[in-house]
Amino acid sequence: MIPRKAFLTKGTGVHKDRLASFELALRDAKIEKYNLVSVSSILPPNCKLVPREEGLAELKPGAIVHCVLARNDTNEPHRLMASAIGTAVPVNEENYGYISEHHSFGEEEIIAGEYAEDLAATMLATTLGIEFDAEMAWHEREQVYKASGHIFDTFHMCQTAKGDKDGKWTTTVAAMVFVTSKC
């Protein structure tokens, strides 16, 4: 079972109950109807990245759906949190890519998103034997990775939120959702 398509999604939920907050975040991300199974960080060879609506059209309620899921929650008022997915796609579509998940507190969306993107790109770069200075800033390493001719694209999706002012549970999710076949 190798996914042939994948899509990114994100969402936020707020509720007095922690589990209900998570459910609302999944609803906001449009993936609450599925039995989600978290998997590790490999983007399969020849897996086409598609818009969320195209991917959702091939899934049916109750289906077992694999995804790389970033999830974070808090009931602390005004606490900033993030859930991010980073992706690195190789030039040669016959090779696999990497997906990373990142969950943090106190990071703005761009910081958390770029961290996840950097992590995925670095994991792919090390498997491809690309030499780089780990102390370089992300934007400098990104140029090294792309100049190598092995990494085609990197990107991220991030959901941030601040904890509900009244202390209700607030949840953020970001996910790379896989489509294996028409359900």
Curated annotation (Swiss-Prot):
Site (Cleavage (non-hydrolytic)): residue numbering on this chain: 40-41
Keyword Lyase: yes
Signal sequence interval, chain numbering: none
InterPro entries reported in the protein's UniProt record: Pyr-dep_his/arg-deCO2ase, Pyr-dep_his/arg-deCO2ase_sand, Pyruvoyl-dep_arg_deCO2ase
Name of the top EC class for this enzyme: lyase
Alphabetical list of Gene3D superfamilies matching this protein: Pyruvoyl-Dependent Histidine Decarboxylase, subunit B
Catalysed reaction equations from the record: L-arginine + H(+) = agmatine + CO2
Keyword Transport appears in the UniProt entry: no
GO molecular function, one term: arginine decarboxylase activity
Domain of life according to the entry: Archaea
Keywords: Decarboxylase, Lyase, Pyruvate
Name of one Pfam family that matches: PvlArgDC
Cofactor field: pyruvate
Biological-process GO terms, alphabetical: arginine catabolic process
Free-text remark on how the cofactor is bound: Binds 1 pyruvoyl group covalently per subunit.
Enzyme Commission no: 4.1.1.19
Modified residues (Pyruvic acid (Ser)): 41
NCBIfam families: pyruvoyl-dependent arginine decarboxylase
Family as reported in the entry's similarity comment: Belongs to the PdaD family.
The protein's name: Pyruvoyl-dependent arginine decarboxylase 2
